């Protein structure tokens, strides 16, 4: 199951980024829902919100370290919880997707833009980012549920 989650996440991420490089890069922006959601081509040379811009080697090294830690954890402890396994697999998938970009392009391709008119723009993101965020939220839920079980609340 974990390998399937990782593979599907990477596949969807790669396909959307290949499309963005081929089509979206030429037009830069395609409005989908007026004043709310656009497809916008961005070459992100940093991390979330552009932090660590130009630090590709550092970001790649940190990503490899985190990936290694998660994989070692999954192999060593073999979590019984399906929620834990899927959430960690999503994080692995997203990390690998963005690592691929950093290694081969020296930037991460971002394409989803959420905004409110021209007043507020959330940083442009990609499928790999979605995998990491959803996986992290699921890990938090798993931890809370696990702690509640220990306390006899669940």
Curated annotation (Swiss-Prot):
UniProt pathway: Protein modification; lipoprotein biosynthesis (signal peptide cleavage)
Subcellular location: Cell membrane
Membrane topology annotation: Multi-pass membrane protein
Gene Ontology process terms (BP): proteolysis
Domain of life: Bacteria
One Gene Ontology term, aspect cellular component: plasma membrane
Active-site residues from the entry: 110, 129
Entry GO MF terms: aspartic-type endopeptidase activity
Protein task: This protein specifically catalyzes the removal of signal peptides from prolipoproteins.
Family, per entry: Belongs to the peptidase A8 family.
Protein name: Lipoprotein signal peptidase
Source species: Clostridium acetobutylicum (strain ATCC 824 / DSM 792 / JCM 1419 / IAM 19013 / LMG 5710 / NBRC 13948 / NRRL B-527 / VKM B-1787 / 2291 / W)
Gene behind this protein: lspA
């Amino acid at each position: 199951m974990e390998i399937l989650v990782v593979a599907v996440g990477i596949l969807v991420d790669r396909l959307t980024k290949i499309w963005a490089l081929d089509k979206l890069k030429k037009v830069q922006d395609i409005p989908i829902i007026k004043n709310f959601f656009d497809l916008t081509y961005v070459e992100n040379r940093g991390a979330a919100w552009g932090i660590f811009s130009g630090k590709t080697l550092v970001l790649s090294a940190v990503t490899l370290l985190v990936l290694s830690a998660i994989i070692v954890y999954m192999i060593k402890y073999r979590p019984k919880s399906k929620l834990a396994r899927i959430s960690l697999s999503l994080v692995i998938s997203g990390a690998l997707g963005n690592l691929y970009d950093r290694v081969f392009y020296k930037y991460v391709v971002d394409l989803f833009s959420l905004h409110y008119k021209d007043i507020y723009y959330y940083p442009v993101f990609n499928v790999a980012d979605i995998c990491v965020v959803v996986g992290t939220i699921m890990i938090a839920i798993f931890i809370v549920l696990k702690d509640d079980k220990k306390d006899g609340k669940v």
